Design a protein with these regions (language model features):
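Short beta-strand->loop
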Residues: 103-112, 127-128, 156, 242-254, ...
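An extracytoplasmic/periplasmic, membrane-proximal ligand-sensing/linker region
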Residues: 191-193, 293-345
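A bilobed periplasmic-binding-protein/Venus flytrap-type ligand-binding module shared by bacterial periplasmic
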Residues: 138-143, 256-268, 287-288
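Periplasmic-binding protein-like
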Residues: 162-170, 197-202, 208-209, 240-264, 279-302
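Extracytoplasmic ligand-binding site segments that recognize negatively charged/polar headgroups
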Residues: 38, 42-45, 68, 82-223
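Early extracytoplasmic/lumenal segment of secretory-pathway proteins
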Residues: 29-95
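A ligand-binding cleft/hinge motif common to bilobed small-molecule-binding domains
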Residues: 92-96, 220, 224-243
Length: 345
């Protein structure tokens, strides 16, 4: 009687072992996708967790840096792409890649539900929009008055010599916020007048940072009196108790849109399409709304406390495709004139 029981136990154990071995390849088949992004560092963890919970067969490997660095990297890798997906990069950069035939056409599932302005006009689509962010002025209401520096209301005000060495803004070659600001000035003022304005502004700049968030943080701390920076960072600093006013310049607010796209040549197309699908889901837009006041899903109004009212009405009229196409020319001129005051990298 003992032998049959033993034989049954051995067979059962063997079956379990075989099942375990069969399960290993299934786990090993998880696809790893390389995602290039300029998202804020505190965003990528929640985005990865939400995507992988919905898609357990795909794992995201982030490559994160500032907009300028990621844009330059994608362009440098044009003939040998390393990224599978771009998720969270300025749409002006993504539009540039599109014009160079670097994106894989794909209309994500559910893309018809998002706002028309947040969709590529191509069919199939080449990219989809996530959210929009604006450039604002963050003015320290405690320290600046001590130095007899009045609260500005316009971009033109920043050329006033009273602000000498008191202003900080992002380097447009590094920061998307910086580039959208310089580009918008050219649209608002005209090219000649804009460069003349920037010559005067340069005299008042203490440093050009490599981050769109840093200027409002520095203004919030009283290290600089005025920061030209990312709208949501200003709102967060003010909500945390910083003595700053967040100002939309009366000439209009520079802006760009974050976008998602699949890189042409990806070896993981099916997995990349899952990222693109997730990026236009309602759940994804709820995540975007935790960091941005303007998102691409209808009916969502995620503006946080202390965010400037009617900000979307202040957005400067721009052509994202032209903004991308003019990038190299504008940055070359800006670097030649002003890069000497850039912070060390």
């Amino acid at each position: 009687m003992f032998k049959p029981k033993l034989r049954g136990w051995v067979l059962g154990a063997a079956a379990l072992a075989v099942s375990a071995l069969l399960a290993v390849p299934a786990y090993a088949q998880k696809t790893r996708v390389t995602v290039y992004s300029a998202l804020e560092s505190d965003q990528i963890g929640p985005y990865k967790a939400a995507f992988e919970a919905a898609n357990p067969d795909v794992e995201i490997a982030w490559v994160r840096d500032s907009t300028g660095v990621i844009t330059a990297r994608v362009l440098a890798e044009k003939d040998n792409p390393r990224a599978d997906v771009i998720w969270g990069l300025g749409a002006s950069s993504v539009a540039l890649f599109d014009s160079m035939d670097m994106l894989q056409p794909y209309t994500p599932k559910g893309a018809d539900q998002i706002k028309p302005a947040f969709r590529s006009t191509k069919n199939p689509m080449s990219w989809t929009g996530m959210d929009a962010w604006l450039a604002v002025m963050c003015y320290n209401t405690v320290e600046a008055p001590k130095k007899n520096m009045p609260k500005p209301t316009s971009w033109a005000d920043l050329a006033n010599p009273v602000y000498k060495d008191a202003i900080v803004m992002p380097n447009p070659a590094s920061s998307g916020t910086g580039y959208q600001t310089v580009y918008a000035w050219i649209q608002i003022m005209g090219e000649k007048a804009a460069w003349e304005f920037m010559d005067k502004l340069h005299n008042n700049i203490a440093v050009y940072t490599h981050s769109g968030s840093a200027p409002c943080v520095q203004a919030a701390k009283g290290e600089r009196m005025i920061g030209i920076g990312f709208d949501m960072r200003g709102a967060r600093e003010k909500t945390a108790g910083a003595p700053i006013d967040i100002i939309l310049a009366k000439e209009g607010a520079p802006w760009d849109m974050e976008a998602t796209a699949i890189v042409k040549g990806t070896k993981n197309l099916a997995a990349a399409q899952k990222v693109a699908d997730f990026a236009v889901s309602k759940g994804a837009y709820e995540l975007y709304g935790k960091s941005y006041a303007i998102v691409g899903y209808p009916g969502m109004n995620p503006a946080p406390p202390n965010y400037p009212p009617s900000a979307d009405a202040a957005m400067v009229k721009i052509d994202l495709s032209k903004m991308g196409a003019d990038r190299a020319k504008i940055l070359a001129e800006w670097t030649k004139r002003y890069d000497g005051k850039s912070a060390p990298k």
